[in-house]
């Protein structure tokens, strides 16, 4: 039997840090194999192939973040009932969450496959990469049910305070993904289809590993009758998960509108922009992990009514996140050109221009990294305290800022508006979650 981690007792700093470290490594590993995907495509197939992959990013992220938002919302109920020691309710939540994930995965896959090419055309995807972009996006969408299952399994494990199993799953999947990338892209000559297929198969392995671990947790015992739909609970789960999902959808929609303006700059510009976004994913993974650790800690202690521990946990986390952002910023500013050359072959036609685009974008983004890190903390804390409305509002703020920069400011300052749009969007989002947190803290937690 495997025990879960009870965060309602013991040292808050120790709980948050020890739980966050495996998550950081997990996210880091996930980003590394996504980087390996992009690097193999960019340097093995070509700059335009990298642009084709990059032009699909926001479209696929909309699906991925919808799934992530819903499953994160569902798992918050698991954390809360675990903190309250209501194990029967907790198991019912797990069962209903699983059924919802199947339904969500099927719906998103069906809609996504039909909408893929029309959406890419609507987003001004350059004609010289449109076919490859369609192949890559449709292959990734075909694996949506697998990704949904993996996200739910990982979220459940984290709700129990188990951050190590997702890490082990990621190590296995990352190794498999890179190996399959090499086989499918170089040996079979499948191009970007091979890279997408490798990612889907790796996610399947991750899910199976996490699922087997969940079955061994002593608190998880789902009886046959628990699979009977409880429509009241289903409604509660959906109503709680939807604001988080909508927040992510809104952010992704803003990114899609931004991508349409990026695509108009041509495939070489898209390649440089894509290379920076791959590095950006690596930079963000630490903040994402700390946010999830905070969410689990806050959800358990909020459910147990231990508000003094919430204040302690927040102070500790803010110190960690600022120090981490400054450290990452310093390292990347020095090495940014070398990082981008992992994806871009400067000896290829268009390579140097793509590299210059990426360096400029990454420089602007990294200077404001601490804002991004703080967003993840405040969003997750509000969610853990059953106050996900402001997370949704922050998503609207990101949407408005991105659209303004991509569609209005671009006429004033040129393509730099596409780079500056990220820090501007982060600032708007941070204000929408930080101010409500301090109001809620003064009114309720104190």
Model-predicted regions and their roles:
Residues 21, 37, 74-75, 115-116, ...:
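Hydrophobic/aromatic residues in alpha-helical transmembrane segments
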Residues 62-65, 177-182, 207-211, 282-285, ...:
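Hydrophobic transmembrane alpha-helices of multi-pass small-molecule transporters
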Residues 71, 140-158, 166-174, 195-208, ...:
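Short runs within selected transmembrane alpha-helices of multi-pass transporters and secretion channels
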Residues 7-44, 58-73, 77, 102-109, ...:
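N-terminal transmembrane alpha-helices
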Residues 18-37, 139, 173, 202-206, ...:
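Transmembrane helical elements of multi-pass membrane transporters/channels
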Residues 32-51, 120-127, 183-190, 249-282, ...:
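Helix-terminus/linker motif at the lipid-water interface of multi-pass membrane proteins
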Residues 50-110, 147-166, 272-336, 372-394:
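Small-residue-rich hydrophobic transmembrane alpha-helices
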Residues 1-20, 78-145, 187-242, 298-367, ...:
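Short alpha-helical transmembrane segments in multi-pass integral membrane proteins
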